Amino acid sequence: MPPLEWHEKLKEAREARGNEGEVNDAPVPLIFDCRNTYETEVGIFEGAEPLATENFRDSWDVFHEKLKDKPKDTPIMTYCTGGIRCVKVGAYLTQEMGFTNVSRLAGGIIAYDRTLNDEAPEEEPMFKGTNYVFDGRVGRQITKDALGKCITCGQNTHLLSNCKNIECHRRMVQCETCNHSYAGRCSVVCKETEIFVDDHSQNS
């Protein structure tokens, strides 16, 4: 589904959720965010349901649980960062689970963000927060909504990073203040352990 068509479908679904759950006499589509937890906790499309997985391979069990009682013609919309994962998801839902009305966001959130900015800048994005990206930026802020919770203090933030302790390097949501206080590390343990390792190597 092209990004602008996706945008309109989400707007229709938002309206329908307040109108007895139907879009033009059709059921509201189920919208699934097929990314992992660390991605969805800082940004998500309005009305979407995250799979809450730690790894993509866990998605199949989640789909079986969420869709076990749904009719096979239930409208299902899926999306991910760049669209690749949803090609696999679409094939699984149709070929393995028998669903007949499955669509995906072509090009993923990246294409949606770019297309909306280029072709419909007056439209309010239906994606809220930050899109996790797999490059040096880590996150691309699409709206100012701070959906994430700092792992250190619990405050709302949109900032994503990787722990700078090379032995950890975990993906984390951490506010600017805590990131500075912990020198880019996720915890006191990571901060102190790395200092110990550095000191040890200098004395050897």
Q: What kind of region is each of these model predictions?
A:
Residues 1-12:
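Fe-S ferredoxin-like electron-transfer domains
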Residues 81:
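Catalytic cores of enzyme domains
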Residues 7, 16-19, 27, 35-75, ...:
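Rhodanese-like catalytic fold shared by cysteine-dependent sulfurtransferases
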